[in-house]
């Protein structure tokens, strides 16, 4: 399971002109599910992201988590994180999970994040979305549950 995690001041997702998810200060997570991902990957990534200390403390040091600052989470499914561009000019998505499996694990990830008592908004699975992200810093982290980065 892969995530692009961005610290934001504001973020929203629009589908067909309608806002389906919107947050203030917090994290926007672009989430990709791989073909061999399991619930263990969901658990690892949810815990890592909710407790990741990438917000500044009173000394300007990245020392506070989403929970510490009372931040919000916007989770957007993005299978293209599994695009393999090493061969040719067009990405291959062979390593991305099938849509039914990806949706199940995506929804488990969202529910697990909510269980940490964090406000979670989402995009719409398998929809064409417009994502507006106001990256704070910018601070952007790449996290892979298989530790491939």
From Swiss-Prot:
GO MF terms on file?
D-tyrosyl-tRNA(Tyr) deacylase activity; Gly-tRNA(Ala) deacylase activity; Ser(Gly)-tRNA(Ala) hydrolase activity; tRNA binding
GO (cellular component) term, any one: cytoplasm
- The Enzyme Commission number assigned here is 3.1.1.96
Q: Does the keyword Transmembrane apply?
A: no
List the catalytic activities from the record. Answer: glycyl-tRNA(Ala) + H2O = tRNA(Ala) + glycine + H(+); a D-aminoacyl-tRNA + H2O = a tRNA + a D-alpha-amino acid + H(+)
Signal peptide span per the entry?
none
Where does it live in the cell?
Cytoplasm
**Out of the domains of life, which is the source?**
Bacteria
Short name of any one Pfam family annotated for the protein:
Tyr_Deacylase
Report keywords, A-Z.
Cytoplasm, Hydrolase, RNA-binding, tRNA-binding
Query: Could you tell me which InterPro entries the record lists for this protein?
Result: Daa-tRNA_deacyls_DTD, DTD-like_sf
Please tell me which stretches of this chain the record labels as motif Gly-cisPro motif, important for rejection of L-amino acids.
137-138
Q: Name one GO biological process term.
A: D-amino acid catabolic process
Cite the PANTHER family for this sequence: D-AMINOACYL-TRNA DEACYLASE 1 (PTHR10472:SF5), D-TYROSYL-TRNA TYR DEACYLASE (PTHR10472)
What domain comment accompanies this record? A Gly-cisPro motif from one monomer fits into the active site of the other monomer to allow specific chiral rejection of L-amino acids.
What does the similarity note say? Belongs to the DTD family.
How this chain assembles, per its entry, is: Homodimer.
HAMAP family (UniProt xref): Deacylase_Dtd
Q: What does this protein do?
A: An aminoacyl-tRNA editing enzyme that deacylates mischarged D-aminoacyl-tRNAs. Also deacylates mischarged glycyl-tRNA(Ala), protecting cells against glycine mischarging by AlaRS. Acts via tRNA-based rather than protein-based catalysis; rejects L-amino acids rather than detecting D-amino acids in the active site. By recycling D-aminoacyl-tRNA to D-amino acids and free tRNA molecules, this enzyme counteracts the toxicity associated with the formation of D-aminoacyl-tRNA entities in vivo and helps enforce protein L-homochirality.
**Listed name of the protein:** D-aminoacyl-tRNA deacylase
């Amino acid at each position: 399971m892969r995530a692009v995690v961005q610290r934001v001041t504001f973020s929203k997702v629009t589908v067909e002109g309608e806002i389906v998810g919107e947050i203030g200060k917090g994290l926007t997570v672009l989430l990709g599910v791989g073909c061999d991902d399991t619930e263990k990957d969901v658990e690892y990534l949810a815990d890592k992201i909710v407790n990741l200390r990438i917000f500044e403390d009173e000394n300007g040091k990245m020392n506070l988590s989403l929970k510490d600052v009372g931040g919000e989470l916007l989770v957007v499914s993005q299978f293209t994180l599994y695009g393999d561009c090493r061969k040719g000019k067009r990405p291959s998505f062979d390593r991305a999970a099938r849509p039914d499996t990806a949706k199940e694990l995506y929804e488990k990830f969202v529910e697990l994040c909510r269980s940490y008592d964090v406000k979670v908004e989402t995009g719409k699975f398998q929809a064409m979305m417009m994502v507006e992200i106001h990256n704070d810093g910018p601070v952007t982290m790449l996290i892979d549950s298989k530790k491939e980065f």
